[in-house]
Amino acid sequence: MDYDVIIIGSGFGGSVPALRLSEKGYRVGVLEQGRKVSPDDMRAADRSLRELFWIPQIGFRGFFVQHFFRHVGIVGGVGVGGGSLVYAAVLLKPGEAFFRDRAWADLGVDWKEELSTHFDTAATMLGRTPNPDHGKMDDWLQATAEAMGAGDTFGPVPQGIYFGNAGKTEPDPFFGGQGPDRTGCTRCGACLTGCSDGSKNSLDKNYLYLAEKLGAEILPGRKAVSIRPLEGGGYEVQTLNPLNRREKHQALRAQRVIVSAGVVGTLDLLFKCRDELRTLPEISPALGDIVRTNSEAIVAALSPNPDEDLTRGAAISSHFHANAHTHITQNRFPPGYDFMRWYMGPLTDGTAAFRRALSTIASIILHPILTLRALFARNWHKRITVLTVMQSLDSQVAFRRGRRPIWPFKPLLHSSPGASGGTPAYIPEANEAARKLAEHIGGTPHNNVLESIGNASVTAHILGGCAIAAGREAGVVDIDHQVFGYPGLFVTDASAIPANVGVNPALTITALAERFSERFPPKGAD
C-alpha cells in the first residue's frame, strides 16, 4: 500500500483527519485537485479573473470556483486548503434547530452534547476570536437589524483571523511555536480572494501545516477520478491533473479512503464510481437525494456616494438574527469581486417564479437609467454592501449524474427539485433586509438575478447529498461516516451533513470531522 489512509480533498472535512490520523500514526496522503496557492497568487487574483477563477478547461488556474445548475448556483474554493482559501472565516455554532432536525435526531446520538467538545477543539484550532472592529458598514447593518426589530441580536462575528498587530509578522501565536509565523490583519477586505497577508487562519496555517510536520503528504494537482476496491481489502484511487490531462499518474493504494472533495466534487466522484465505472455499485440509492443550500439568499444595497469606500475591515465583521430561523451577515468585496456587479438586478418580491422574473425584467426595461447607473457604478466594489441571508428551515434539491439533452456527450452532474419542492430563490426576510438597508443609506436595493430571474438559489454553503443516516435506504454513511456496504470508505465533508446549519457552516464541518477522527481507531487496533 502507498498509504494507510488516502484523503481526497484538503478542505475542512479533509484537513482535520489529515492531522488527527497522522497523530495516531497513520501514513496519510492528501489529494488536492488545485494548486498550492501563494500570497503572490492571491494578489494576482485581485487583478485578474484568470488568476482568480478555477476553470481548468480553458486555462483559468485560480482557486475560486462557481458551479451553475438549474436549481442552484454554488461558489467555493479549490486548492490546498479548499474552501478556507476564499471563506470569510466566520466561525459560528448552529442553533437548536440544527441539532434537533428530524433528518438525524433519531439516530441514537445526542448531537449537541456529543459535538460540544469538538466545537471547542475546532474553535481553538481555527483561532476563533470576536472581530474587534466596528466601521460604517457595521453601523449600517446594525441600523438594518434595528429596523427589522432585531437590534438586540446584532454583534460582531466570531472569526478565524489573527488580528494581532496590523502588518507585523510574529512567531506562531496559536500552537506553542509549532505553527507558522503569522502577520496581523491589515483590514484590507480581501478575505474572499485569499489573504495574501497570511492573517486568515486558513487550513494551510493550522491543520494541514501540522499534519505535514507529522509526515502527511499533500499532493496538489491530483484530482481523484475513480475509487476501486481491492481484493483482500483496501482501495485504489486513480487521479489526473486537471491543468495537464496528459500528465500520467500511477494509481495510489491505501487500506482506507476518506472522500472530502466538497459537495459537488464528492457527489460527482461517487456517482461516477457507482453508475458509470461500476467500481462502487452498492453505494446507497439515496446518493444525492437530499442536498441543502443552507436556505441561502444573496441581496445587496449600493451606496449613492460614488466616493464611498466600505472596504476597510474583514470581509464579514458583524451579523444579526432577523428571527428564530434567519441569520444575516454583511460582506465587503475586494477588487477581484467587481465581476459580481453583473449578477445584480433590481429588488423584486414574490414566490411565483415566472411572475417575479417578468417583474424583474420589466423593472430593468422601464428604468434603464437606474439599471445602467447601478451596473456601471464607479467604485462599485467599494460602495456595495452585500448581505448573506441563511435559514435553518427545511429545504432541499436533489442531484443526479447523467447525459442531458443540452450536453449529451458525457455524463454530468445536474439538479432537480427535492422532496420539499426545491430550495428558496426568494426569501422575504432577505428582501426586507436589503430594502431597509437601502432606505437607511439612501441607496438602491438589489437581488441576485440568478435568484430573481433564474429562480435558482445561490449559496456558498452547499450541504448534504451523502447524509448520515440509520441505513442505506435513507442515506449514504453511518454515524461514523462510513459508506454503507464499503468498509474503510468514508465521507467527512459537508456532504455528510443532513440538515441546514442556518449559519456559516465551517465550524460545524470541522467539529464533525474532529468527532470522526476521535472515533477512528488507533493504528493497529483492528
Regions found by a protein language model. Give the residues of each.
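N-terminal Rossmann-like FAD-binding beta1-loop-alpha1 element of flavoenzymes
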Residues: 5-30
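Residue-level detector of alpha-helix initiation sites
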Residues: 11-12, 264, 496
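Glycine-rich loop(s) and the adjacent beta-strand/alpha-helix scaffold that form part
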Residues: 23, 34-44, 197-200, 205, ...
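Redox-cofactor-proximal catalytic regions of oxidoreductases
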Residues: 49-133
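A glycine-rich dinucleotide-binding beta-alpha-beta segment and adjacent secondary-structure elements
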Residues: 61, 157, 188-191, 229, ...
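FAD cofactor-binding and catalytic pocket of flavoenzymes
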Residues: 68, 83, 87, 284-411, ...
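Conserved redox-cofactor binding core of oxidoreductases
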Residues: 106-221, 455-458
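Patatin-like phospholipase A catalytic core
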Residues: 133-181, 185, 330-340, 345-393, ...
